[in-house]
Amino acid sequence: MQRGIQGYTIPQGTGNERYGTFVPHPLPPDPAIVWSNQLRNKFDQAILALGRLDSMAMLLPDTTLFLYTYVRKEAVLSSMIEGTQSSLTDLLLFELDEVPGVPLDDVREVSNYVAAMERGIMRIRDGFPISLRLIREIHAMLLKQGRGADQTPGEFRRSQNWIGGTRPGNAIYVPPPANLVLDCMGDLEKFINDIPEQTPVLLKAALVHVQFETIHPFLDGNGRLGRLLITLILLQQGFLHQPLLYLSLYFKTHRNRYYELLTLVRTEGRWEEWLDFFAEAVIITATQAVEAAQQLLELLEQDRLRINQLQRIRLSCLHVHRALSERPISNARWLVERTGLTSMTVNKALVQLQALGIVQPHTAQKRNRTYAYTDYIAVLNRGTELPPPA
C-alpha cells in the first residue's frame, strides 16, 4: 500500500543552500498496516523461527559457550554495514591485547558495540524499560573511544546531520532539525512502551527500527544503535531469552535493498514491503543461527570424543578445549586464567590439541602464543568475511 509521504518537510537554509528536513509522523502508521495473507503468513513464519531459536538456546548445555561469540558476530556485522573493516578474528585478537590485521580504530568501533550491547542487555535483565535515558546510555558506550568519540556520545544532537552527500544541500536524506529531535524521540519512546496501545512485539521491533533511522537522533552511531534496538525489544518482551539473533547478517547481504526500503517507507509509506523484508530477515537469520549452533555442538562433541582417546593429560585437554569453545582465539595466558591449570600443563594440552588438528597457532612467537580453534571459527565466520579490496 502506498500511503504517501510519512511526515512533513521543513524548509531550511538560505540563498543557494536550501534544503528540507524531514519530520516523521509518530508511530503507528496511518492508515494502518494492511495484512495480506502473504504478509501475515510471513510474520507467522518469523515468529515460529524465533521460537525455534529461543527453544534451542534454552536447551543448550551451556549458553555461555555461544553468547560470547554470537554477540561479537553481530557487532562485527552491524559495524561492517557502516564500512568498518574488522573481522571476527580481528576483534578476538584485540580483546587479547594482540595486534589485529586492520586499523585499531575499526576494531575499537566493534569492541564499543559489544560493550554497548552488553550494557543494554544487562539493563533489560535488571528490569529497565527501553527509555530515552537507556538509549543515551547505550550510545555513550557505543562511541566511548575511537572514531566518533568527539561526536557527543550519549547526547542527542544539537546540530543538523544528513545522509549522503557533503552537506545538507546535496544530501540523499536530511533528518529532523535538532530542535525537534527530543519531540520525535519522545513519541518513539511512548510507542516502544505501548502508550497509548499495545503493539505486537515483532511488528514493534520492525517499525521502531525504521523510525529510529528516520529520526537519526545522534551525530554518529545511529545505524548500529538502530539495529541493536531490535534485539533489545525482542529480549525485553520475552521473544528471545538470549541475544542469538544477528539480523545484521541479512541487512549486510541485502544492503542496497535495506537502504532502498528505508527511503520508500519515508517517501511513499510502503511499510508492508519493509515488513515483508524484515520478516524474511528474521526467518533466514534465526534458521541460520539454529543451524550454526547445531554444527558447533556437533563439532564440540566430535572433538571431545577424539580428546577422550588420548592416553595422557586427557582431562587437561578437555578443560582447555572447553575454554577454547568460549573464546576460539586464545593465548596461553588467558587459558591459564580460565582453566586454573599451570602454564606448563596448558602448553602441553595445546601441543596435543594441535597434533589432533583441533587448534592451530595463530601467531609465531614462542612465548604466550595465540591459538585458533579453526573449525569453530570457520562456522562462526560465515557471512562475516571482509569485502575484497577495491
What are these language model-derived features?
Residues 1-390:
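FIC/Doc superfamily catalytic core
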